[in-house]
Amino acid sequence: IQIDGVEHCGQTNQGEFLVTISATDVSSHWWEGEAVLGKGQTRTLEALKAIRGRFPIGWQEIHPDNGSSFINYFVYDYAHKTKLEFSRSRPYKKNDNCFVEQKNSKNVRQVVGHVRYDTIREQDILNDLYHNELRLYKNFFQAAMRLETKERNNGHIYRKYQEAKTPYQYLMDNPNTTEEAKQKLKSEYENLNPAKLKRSIQAKLKLLGEIYKAKYGTNIAQNDESKVTFSFDPTTGFRLP
């Protein structure tokens, strides 16, 4: 399981802001997220526990980057006590965590944008999405491709990909997924409506946008950023003018 943190600090990393703890299973591309306030080690550990509890399959190994939120006694001790292998990315080798980095972009940044979130209300909305509609929509209805072969010929790189599947399909096709897990996933899938999930995601993103704008609109004199006009697209998040 690759793990990373996505900072919602906007244009400045001063003060306390929300961080999305993002986790991806390499074999199936299944993704889960959890928003925490700040980068505290104990909060990060609690987020990992919550994420692990929502995963449809068991964990064997966690592989974070080199941030102090993950490389610390609390996380290491938890991994040791729960019999998890603990590895980490090599310094300055961002591709070591390429799968979760892709999900950071697709499932977090492209959804909620690059602006600053730093309130409990915003945290509640993000986690409402991560715990419910967003995780269901991304894992059951958005396909991902696996790289099958990569060849270099005369200075050109040729890549061949496997047939695109959703994380749900990858898990259902995996012989290592238990029958109990497959039955639970199938039952959940049969009760989902992607159009309804999408509408609910858009409604919650709209509410998140309204809270963000109201936050800066009430503090114009103290914050120059609030004078900037933001446009909001519910499907992709905020975009600066």
Predicted regions mapped to residue ranges:
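RNase H-like two-metal-ion nuclease catalytic core shared by retroviral integrases
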Residues: P64-N66, F70-A79, F86-V112, I125-N127, ...
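Short, solvent-exposed helix-loop connector elements
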Residues: V111-N127, M145-K150
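Charged, gly/pro-enriched flexible loop segments at helix/strand junctions
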Residues: N132-Y168
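Protein C-terminal end segments and domain termini
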Residues: Y130, E163, P167-Y168, E180-K184, ...
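Residue-level recognition of single "structural anchor" positions
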Residues: I1-T12, F55, F74-T82, P91
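Active-site beta-loop-alpha junctions of metal-dependent nucleic acid enzymes
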Residues: T24, G33-P56
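An active-site-proximal beta-strand-loop segment
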Residues: I1-W31
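Short, conserved catalytic/metal-binding motifs centered on acidic residues
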Residues: D4, H29, I62-D65, K138, ...
